[in-house]
């Protein structure tokens, strides 16, 4: 757990303090995370409509899969406890 926290802090520090401007030079004057030079490379925040639909469809699929796995696990535990109980 400690190595995950250390890695997270290291990555956050790199994002916040080593942003580059358009010329490729480190921009220490603007250490604002929301500055355009600090945005992720190759990942657009405002995507097209198809990208948005694909994202939400994927998110819905993951949610349905997690809910079905949780339901299956609870149903299996309930069935096992009912079969072991004596009436």
Swiss-Prot record:
Membrane side Virion surface: which residues? 25-48
Q: Where in the cell is it found?
A: Virion membrane; Host membrane; Host Golgi apparatus, Host trans-Golgi network
Transmembrane residue ranges:
49-69
The residue ranges for the Intravirion side of the membrane come to 70-87
GO CC, one annotated term: host cell membrane
Q: Pfam families recorded for this chain?
A: Herpes_UL49_5
Q: Which residues belong to the signal peptide in this entry?
A: 1-24
Keywords, comma-separated and alphabetical: Disulfide bond, Host Golgi apparatus, Host membrane, Membrane, Signal, Transmembrane, Transmembrane helix, Viral envelope protein, Virion
Q: How does the protein's chain sit in the membrane according to the entry?
A: Single-pass type I membrane protein
Q: Which family does it belong to?
A: Belongs to the herpesviridae glycoprotein N family.
Biological role stated in the UniProt entry? Envelope glycoprotein necessary for proper maturation of gM and modulation of its membrane fusion activity. Also plays a critical role in virion morphogenesis.
What does the subunit section of this Swiss-Prot or TrEMBL entry state? Interacts (via N-terminus) with gM (via N-terminus). The gM-gN heterodimer forms the gCII complex.
Record HAMAP family: HSV_GN
**Name of the protein in question:** Envelope glycoprotein N
Species annotation: Varicella-zoster virus (strain Dumas) (HHV-3)
Question: Which gene produces this protein?
Answer: gN
């Amino acid at each position: 757990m400690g190595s995950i926290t250390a890695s997270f802090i290291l990555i956050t520090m790199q994002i916040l303090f080593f942003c580059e401007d358009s010329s490729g030079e480190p921009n220490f004057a603007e250490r604002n995370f929301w500055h355009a030079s600090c945005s992720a490379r190759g990942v657009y925040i405002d995507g097209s409509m198809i990208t948005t639909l694909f994202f939400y469809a994927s998110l819905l699929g993951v949610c349905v899969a997690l809910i079905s796995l949780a339901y299956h696990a609870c149903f299996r535990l309930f069935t096992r406890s009912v079969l072991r109980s004596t009436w």
